[in-house]
């Protein structure tokens, strides 16, 4: 090996800096590759802002447009409660009427006291009235039930918001993990490009001195060009992923962002506590079941009589000429009347309307219970599958990581042998291809492992830990 090294130095004095200190630089290269492996990168510009997963989650929860709509719906449902509560309060209305009886009606009364069988009286042509009317329910079971229904609907609105918030946390986390995986891929491709550029320089030097064929130089250039295309594609993909992330969290589109690097040595496994009994999917269905049961009660309460308090204060005037409204005197006199009473409403027959509504509600209740059973079994299946996937993905991740490191070592050995003139260019390129494949498998296994971890956090009810105790 030393003779080969001396031979190279003597034949290629111009390339002495490339070959003479190779073994002295080997440790430094490995250190650089380790940094590339873990995805450590320096932001390309001062304008880039590095966002952690926790930053993205907090920003998204506060600013996501769809979640803001859900938040407004939650606020709106509170007014529905006040709206139904207002039905229990007195309702006071002011009314006014004016009539022009151009063909006045008549009033017929007993006229025997006047020597006539009937006494016919004509109504004056013009009359007007105005005043106030009062109505207040004293007992109306339907109104009481509708108030309790509005409270359940408010609860459903709150649960819908919390579920949308949880779904947003999952969406942002998956997008963040995907962006981290692409960033990690870029770092590995960049390190591979550096390796091939060094190999190209060595091969070019060999070719210039008659120790390699032109086809070897072309092979390296082809692989180098392919890697550059992969790098450009990954860079474009990362840009799209970051743009989509900014859209989801409603981050200013003109600002440049970067993600924190992945720490593959510090992945916190989820605590497998079993499927949570407090998942929003189940709580929503339970609240909807309660809603349907109360709606059934409200239909049944429609058969119960209702009692209301009524009252009025009215002023009425009559005249035979329109101009008298603007004159004082007997022809423009207003008569006051007032009263208070009770109004009882007893339902007797509604054409079987409530009966049909009750049957529909029974079917809705049966359907919601079937949906509960289906959702429960579905979530249980998801949990079992996710648990199996977690173990499998964890095992695959460790294997692919070992394979990646092993493929890198094999490539380094083959590169050394090529520099010494022992291995062929074909062997180097084959090992480089195997190393690239191992890198891609490693990145894919890492991403799958993290996503499975995320799914189990959701199913076990621990998704909120991402906001307070997450690891990037």
Predicted regions and their residues:
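A short glycine-centered flexible hinge/capping loop motif at secondary-structure junctions
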Residues: 207-211, 418-422, 459
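Sec/SRP-type N-terminal targeting helices
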Residues: 68-72, 85-86, 138-165, 215, ...
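Short terminal targeting/anchoring segments
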Residues: 215, 420-444
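Acidic, low-complexity, intrinsically disordered peripheral segments
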Residues: 24-26, 441-472
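Small/polar, glycine/serine/threonine/aspartate-rich low-complexity segments that form flexible
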Residues: 95-132, 310-346, 470-472
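Bacterial Sec-dependent N-terminal signal peptides
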Residues: 1-57, 61-64, 443, 468-472
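Periplasmic alpha-helical coiled-coil/stalk elements that build and connect Gram-negative outer-membrane
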Residues: 79, 165-278, 393
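Bacterial Sec-pathway N-terminal export signals of envelope proteins
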Residues: 47-93, 97, 103, 253, ...
């Amino acid at each position: 090996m030393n003779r080969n090294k001396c031979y190279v130095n003597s034949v290629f004095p111009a390339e002495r800096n490339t070959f003479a200190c190779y073994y002295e630089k080997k440790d430094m290269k490995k250190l650089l590759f380790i940094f590339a492996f873990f995805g450590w990168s320096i932001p390309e510009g001062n304008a880039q802002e590095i966002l952690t997963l926790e930053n993205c989650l907090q920003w998204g929860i506060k600013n996501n447009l769809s979640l803001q709509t859900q938040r407004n719906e939650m606020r709106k449902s509170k007014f529905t409660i006040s709206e139904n509560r207002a039905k229990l309060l007195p309702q006071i209305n002011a009314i006014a009427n004016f009539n022009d009886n151009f063909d006045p009606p008549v009033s017929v009364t007993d006229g025997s006291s006047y020597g006539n069988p009937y006494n016919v009286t004509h109504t004056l042509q013009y009359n007007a009235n105005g005043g106030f009317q009062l109505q207040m329910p004293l007992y109306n079971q339907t109104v009481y039930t509708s108030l309790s229904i509005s409270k359940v609907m408010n609860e459903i609105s709150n649960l819908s918001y919390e579920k949308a918030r949880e779904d947003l946390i999952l969406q942002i986390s998956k997008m963040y993990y995907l962006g981290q995986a692409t960033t990690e891929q870029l770092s590995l491709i960049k390190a591979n490009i550096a390796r091939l550029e060094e190999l190209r320089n060595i091969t070019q030097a060999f070719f210039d001195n008659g120790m390699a064929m032109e086809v070897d130089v072309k092979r390296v250039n082809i692989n180098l060009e392919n890697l550059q295309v992969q790098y450009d594609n990954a860079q474009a993909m990362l840009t799209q992923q970051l743009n989509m992330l900014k859209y989801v969290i409603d981050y200013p589109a003109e600002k440049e962002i970067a993600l924190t690097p992945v720490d593959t040595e510090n992945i916190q496994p989820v605590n497998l506590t079993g499927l949570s009994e407090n998942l929003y999917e189940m709580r929503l269905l339970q609240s909807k079941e309660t809603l349907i049961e109360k709606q059934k009660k409200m239909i049944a309460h429609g058969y119960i009589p209702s009692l209301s308090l009524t009252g009025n204060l009215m002023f009425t005037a009559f005249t035979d000429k329109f101009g008298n409204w603007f004159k004082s005197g007997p022809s423009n006199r207003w008569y006051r009347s007032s009263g208070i009473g009770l109004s009882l409403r007893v339902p007797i027959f509604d054409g079987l309307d409530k009966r049909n509504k009750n049957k529909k509600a029974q079917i809705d209740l049966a359907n919601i219970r079937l949906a509960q059973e289906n959702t429960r079994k579905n979530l249980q299946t998801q949990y079992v599958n996710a648990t199996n996937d977690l173990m499998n993905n964890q095992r695959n991740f460790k294997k692919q990581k070992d394979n990646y490191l092993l493929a890198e070592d094999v490539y380094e050995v083959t590169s050394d042998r090529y520099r010494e003139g022992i291995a062929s260019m074909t062997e180097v390129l084959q090992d480089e291809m195997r190393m690239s494949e191992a890198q891609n498998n490693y990145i894919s296994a890492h991403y799958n492992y993290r996503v499975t971890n995320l799914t189990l956090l959701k199913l076990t009810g621990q998704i909120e830990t991402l906001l307070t105790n997450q690891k990037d």
